[in-house]
């Protein structure tokens, strides 16, 4: 990876990553992942699964998470633009219930790529205005018996730390976006806390559990 920058966000452990593309008259070349360039992966099982997701315009997905095994995700747009969302679901965390929204985009003209690290202990989803293709690098293999979700439109999510422009856009797109019944009717933060499964995500001073 070329000229990697890893930047903190308003919620500890959630990280923004950017790196350069090598460009010339032929086009560009980019290393999209080199584990040794991403020190936060040292506390994980490294990348064990890669997913690709295509979404049509005006779609909301999420907010998903799992345990046994825990799954952290590095998310990048391959084509188009998404607004990536993460919400802290760790019991006892000082930022429990708070969410962030980041714009991730990619085009052939970009000289940089950007990605987001959503560690275990965070529910993840996104919304799109236009068609988009994204890729996930995952630190755990998918496990249907231990997956769960928070509804992205749950009224008790606190978006006060998120970019206000993106929050307003999210509120607007909710009126017309396509969202599955499973995602729409997912947990609120209150019902998640009341679930025995929430004991799988306990905040500690060392960060997210894995």
What do these predicted ranges mean?
Residues 105-131, 138-139:
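Conserved metal-binding segment of the jelly-roll/cupin
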